[in-house]
Curated annotation (Swiss-Prot):
PANTHER family: AMINO ACID TRANSPORTER-RELATED (PTHR42770), GLUTAMATE_GAMMA-AMINOBUTYRATE ANTIPORTER-RELATED (PTHR42770:SF15). This is Probable agmatine/putrescine antiporter AguD. One of its GO terms (biological process) is amino acid transport. It comes from Lactococcus lactis subsp. lactis (strain IL1403) (Streptococcus lactis). Keywords: Amino-acid transport, Cell membrane, Membrane, Transmembrane, Transmembrane helix, Transport. Its main location: membrane. It comes from the Bacteria. It is a multi-pass membrane protein.
Length: 466
């Protein structure tokens, strides 16, 4: 320990990466792709995770501190792009929080068997949201037991699901038969709309960089935890996805309850102590997700606010520990608004409605990271790089372009309606409209800041927006 602060060991850092990057609730939407998910996993692990992991390791160990991707993008380009990235990166979090909150009433129903009315369900969702807000007001090292516990529970759920899948496949057969044709991509628009979930499942490594001050040796631990954690996470995802695919036909899979449904099908019962335990553990992983992400998201939002690139309210911090209560409070307010208006939405698959919108905004924040990596190599070659991606200039361009192109293509399939039947429009139009609304709000914030900087020529950011 140093200065009385508990430090992350490498083991804790790896578990934290697993807790951050592996999100159990995303297993079912990925399984909705069908058997071809394994093809996409392999392709995206090589074409996306590898360059993304290498780039994040270099940027995270070279440019340390609270800013994360906001810092990288701002250094490479300007504050306008940094402001966009910080806005998308922050606003996805309360949407994600809302998507997990709406799962809690159904999980409690599975655990205890009683039906909840709308008022009680809303109360449970609000309790989930504001408990997360409260926990996020304390340093991440104070919650290390939540991070480690969340990682262990997620791994247990994935191994149990995959193990039951193997047993069921050997004894009862599979719901989705495996053929060479089914393992190859079909390129139907419904399946392709879920590809962004795989990318989401492979993102998040940069959050570990915001824990640098809590690590024993961040320059070594960050790349080690990303590499080891990435290998473990890829294996966990594919094993758990196999279990879901064994249990439930793809066309009957629920994106919100698919994980618990799979246990119920393979065990042959919708109730019982083990099913209740699975639902309880699954709910604990939702808390772990929010706690592990809240610190990094709030840090970046408040740091950007300090630099004039987010509304000033986000920069408000607790005097006792420097944690941003402004960003935490805004998380709670936005998530509360979302769950309150949820019953009015046309698509009542609320988890997917909010989760997919969170996906779109989250992925948007990453697009500038990859060109920022390449540009920083060109304009800032003298800065020491404890971990440096090797390769020629051509290889670096491939590392830059490949993940960026993959994100853009996945966004098109997720956010833009490419089929015009009523069911498709009901599912995708709210995502499209929601994304446009949040993009416009972000641009209005940037425009307002630009006007303020023009009226205050002494500001250090005035030229950054030009």
């Amino acid at each position: 320990m140093e200065n009385g602060k508990e430090k992350f060991s490498l083991f804790s850092a790896i578990l934290s990466v697993i807790c951050v990057v592996f999100v159990a609730e995303a297993a079912a939407p990925v399984a909705a792709i069908g058997n071809s998910q394994f093809f996409w996993w392999i392709v995206l692990i090589v074409a996306f995770l590898l360059p993304y992991g290498l780039i994040t390791s270099e940027l995270g160990t070279t440019y340390t501190g609270e800013g994360g991707l906001y810092d990288w993008i701002t250094k490479a380009f300007d504050h306008r792009w940094g402001a966009r990235a910080s806005w998308f990166y922050w606003v996805n979090f309360p949407l994600w929080m809302a998507s997990l909150a709406v799962l809690c009433p159904d999980l409690l129903h599975t655990m205890f068997g009683f039906q909840l009315n709308t008022g009680i369900s809303l109360l449970i969702e609000l309790i989930f949201i504001w408990v997360i807000v409260l926990i996020s007001l304390y340093p991440v090292s104070d919650s290390v037991w939540i991070l480690n516990g969340g990682a262990v529970i997620k791994v247990f759920l994935a191994l149990a699901l995959g193990g039951l899948g193997v047993y069921s496949a050997l004894t009862k057969g599979v719901a989705n038969h495996y053929t060479l044709a089914s393992l190859l991509p079909s390129f139907d628009l419904h399946s392709l709309s879920f590809i962004s979930v795989i990318i989401f499942n492979l993102l998040g490594f940069e959050v570990i960089c915001t824990f640098a001050d809590s690590m024993e040796n961040p320059k070594k631990q960050i790349p080690q935890s990303i590499i080891i954690g990435g290998i473990v996470i890829a294996a966990i995802y594919m094993f758990s996805a196999f279990g879901i695919g064994v249990a439930i036909p793809t066309n009957k899979l629920s994106t919100s309850s698919g994980l618990v449904d799979s246990f119920q099908v393979m065990l042959g019962t919708p109730t019982g102590w083990f099913i209740s335990l699975i639902a309880f553990l699954f709910m604990l992983t939702l808390v772990g997700n929010m706690v592990s992400w809240s610190q990094g998201v709030n840090n970046i939002a408040s740091y950007a606010a300090d630099n004039g690139d987010m509304p000033k309210f986000f920069s408000k911090r607790r005097a006792s520990n420097g944690i941003s209560w402004g960003a935490a409070l805004m998380n709670g307010i936005v998530a509360t608004f979302i769950v309150v208006i949820a019953p009015l939405l046309p698509n009542q698959d609320l988890f997917w409605s909010f989760f997919s919108l969170n996906l779109v905004l989250f992925l948007l924040s990453y697009i500038p990271v990859f060109p920022a990596f390449y540009k920083l190599r060109k304009i800032d070659p003298e800065t020491p790089r404890p971990f440096k991606v090797s390769g020629s200039d051509g290889i670096l361009k491939v590392y830059m372009a490949l993940p960026m192109i993959i994100i853009i293509i996945s966004l098109i399939f997720t956010a833009i309606p490419l089929q015009y039947d009523k069911a498709s429009l009901t599912e995708q139009l709210p995502i499209t409209i929601g994304a446009i609304i949040f993009i416009v709000i972000g641009e209005l914030i940037i425009k307002r800041k630009l006007q303020v900087q023009v009226s205050q020529p002494s500001s250090s950011h005035m030229n950054s927006y030009s």
